[in-house]
Amino acid sequence: MAIATSAQLARALYDNTAESPQELSFRRGDVLRVLQREGAGGLDGWCLCSLHGQQGIVPANRVKLLPAGPAPKPSLCPASPTQPGSSCPTPERGCEEQEVYVIPPPARPCSASGLPARSCSPSSDSIYKVPRGNGMQLTASRDVAEVYDVPPNILRAPSSCPYDSPASFSCPVAPVVPQPPREDEAPYDVPLALKPPAELERDPEWEGGREPGPPLYAAPSNLKRASALLNLYEAPEELLANGESRDADEGIYDVPLLGPEPPSPEPPVASSSTDLDTVAQLPTRSSPPQHRPRLPSTESLSRRPLPALPVSEAPAPSPAPSPAPGRKGSIQDRPLPPPPPCLPGYGGLKPEGDPECREVANDPAGPHNEYEGIPMAEEYDYVHLKGVDTAQGSRPLDKAFPVDPELLERGLAERKEALSPEEPLVLSTGDLQLLHFYAGQCQSHYSALQAAVAALVASTQANQPPCLFVPHGKRVVVAAHRLVFVGDTLGRLAASAALRAQVGAAGTMLAQTLRATVLAVKGAALGYPSDTAVQEMARCVAELAGQALRFTTLLDGLLP
C-alpha cells in the first residue's frame, strides 16, 4: 500500500490506548500527522497517522482534522546576498518530515533600506526561543551553544562579593555637608518659628533672583515665607503681625523644663523680695499686654510659677532645696509648717516624760510635719470604736456642763462673749479668702452639731436603749469631725504663722475632745443601763459642743 505524503494535521479529541500492534496510542490534545485519510486505503473509520516517528492506524472519530495553513508566499523584498544578517534560510522538507515536533516556520520580516538588517532565524543550536535584548547584538566572542539568552550585567565591575547585585545607578547624588549639633539645641522636636520679613530679604539664596536647586529633603514652605496663607501651623494673628518685636528665640510652644536649675547664690533671707522682683519684671520681658495671646489651655496654669506670699514674721530656717527652684513660691512645693505652740487659752504643755515630746526633742533636724510623732492607732481611735480607752488620762478634763439644754445654751453664750480676739491679725489676701470660705462652712457644721447634741441629750433623758441613742451619737461625731477637718486644712494652707498657730491649737483640742466623746458614747452603749456611763457621755458631749463653739467663734473673730 503506497503512502501518499500529506501535510494534513489532526488533533486528538480523546485519549486512546492501542489494542493492536498496528494502532497508535495517544492522549487528548496531541497533534498527529495524517498520512492517509479515512477510507483512502479501504480503511473505513480509520486514518493512517504518524506520532513521534511511529506510524499506525487511528480511530477517525477520536481525532479532528485541522485546517491546512496557507501556502507560503514569496518574499516581496528579496534579500541581498551581500548582507548575511538579512538572509532567511528556509528549512528543507526532508528536515520537516524527520522532526519530532511540528514547529511553524519563523517570520520573515522585510529589512528597511536604511536600517541594518537583523537575523530573523534563531541559532541552530538554541533549544528555546527567547526574545532578544533591546538593542543588543550577539557578539562573535559569545558562546554559540548557550542555552539561555541573558543580557550581560550593566557596568559590572569585578568584585569578590558572592551575591550578584545590580550595579548602582549613575545618577549623581547631591553631597550632604554634615552639620555638627549646636550647643543650644533643645532635645525636644519643636517646629521652627516663622522668620520675620527682614530676615527673608537678606537671605542670600533669594537675592540672585532665582530659586535654589531642589533640596534633598522636603521642608514646609512657611519656614521661609511669612505668609498667612502658607502657614502650616495655626497661630494668633497678633504673633504674625508683631513678629519683628518678638525675640528671635521666643516661640509659641510651651516646652517643659528638663531638670532642676542651678541654685541661686542669693541668701535665703531675700527670697521673698527676689520673688516679688521677678514677678515685677515679668511684664517688661514679655510682649505688650494688648498683644499677648491667650494661654493654650488651663493645664498651663499649673506650670506657671506662683508668687510667694509676703510674710511679716521673722524668716524660718531654710528648708531642704526644692526639686524645682523656679517654683519655690508655689503653695504645693512649700514644706508643711511646724506644729503650732500650745496657747494658754487652749491647754497646757505636755509633761516632760511624754514619749512624743522626747521623740521630737531628739530629732536633730527639727519637726518637719505636724503629724510626725502621732501614732496611727491613737489618731484614728475615735473612728474604729474598739479597744481600751488609752488616752483618757493623758489630759485633764474641764468641769462638766449640766445636762439641762437651757443651761447648756446659756453656758455656750457666755463662752462666745468671752472668746474675742485681743489683737486683730494682719492677714494677706489669700489668708482672708481662706478664712471667709471656711468660716461659712463652720457655721453650717456647728448648726448640724447643735441639732445632733440636742437629740442625743433628749434621748438620754428619756432613758432610751443604745439602739436609739447611738445613731444620735454618730451624728454628733460626724458633725464634729467636719470641724476638725476644716481646722486641719486651714492650718496647712494659711501663710501667716500666727493664724496657723491659733487655728491649729483650737483644732487639736477639738480633735482630742471628739476622741473622748466617741469612747464615752461607746462606753455608755456597752454599760447600759449604767447611770455613771450615761453621765460621762453627757459630760463629754457638752465639752465637745463647747470646743466646737470655741473653734467657730475663733474663725469668726479673725475676720475683719
Curated annotation (Swiss-Prot):
Residues covered by region (Disordered): 176-219, 241-372
Ranges for domain SH3: 5-68
Motif stretch (SH3-binding): 304-310, 334-340
Positions of post-translational Phosphotyrosine modification: 253
MF term (GO), any: SH3 domain binding
Residue spans of biased composition, Basic and acidic residues class: 198-210, 351-361
Modifications made to the protein after synthesis: Phosphorylated on multiple tyrosine residues. Phosphorylated on tyrosines by FYN and SRC.
Biased composition (Pro residues): 259-268
Disulfide bond sites: none
A GO BP entry: cell adhesion
Segments of skewed composition (Low complexity): 305-315
Chain coiled-coil ranges: none
PROSITE patterns from the UniProt entry: SH3 (PS50002)
Keyword terms, alphabetized: Cell adhesion, Phosphoprotein, SH3 domain, SH3-binding
Highest rank taxon of the organism: Eukaryota
SMART domains, sorted: SH3
Tissue: Widely expressed. Higher levels found in placenta and embryo. Lower levels found in brain, brainstem, muscle and lung. No expression in liver and intestine.
Residue span of region Divergent helix-loop-helix motif: 437-487
Similarity comment: family membership: Belongs to the CAS family.
Free-text domain note: Contains a central domain (substrate domain) containing multiple potential SH2-binding sites and a C-terminal domain containing a divergent helix-loop-helix (HLH) motif. The SH2-binding sites putatively bind CRK, NCK and ABL SH2 domains.
Function statement: Docking protein which plays a central coordinating role for tyrosine-kinase-based signaling related to cell adhesion. May serve as an activator of SRC and a downstream effector. Interacts with the SH3 domain of FYN and with CRK, SRC, and YES.
Protein name (record): Embryonal Fyn-associated substrate
Species per Swiss-Prot/TrEMBL record: Mus musculus (Mouse)
Classification lineage: Eukaryota, Metazoa, Chordata, Craniata, Vertebrata
Gene: Efs
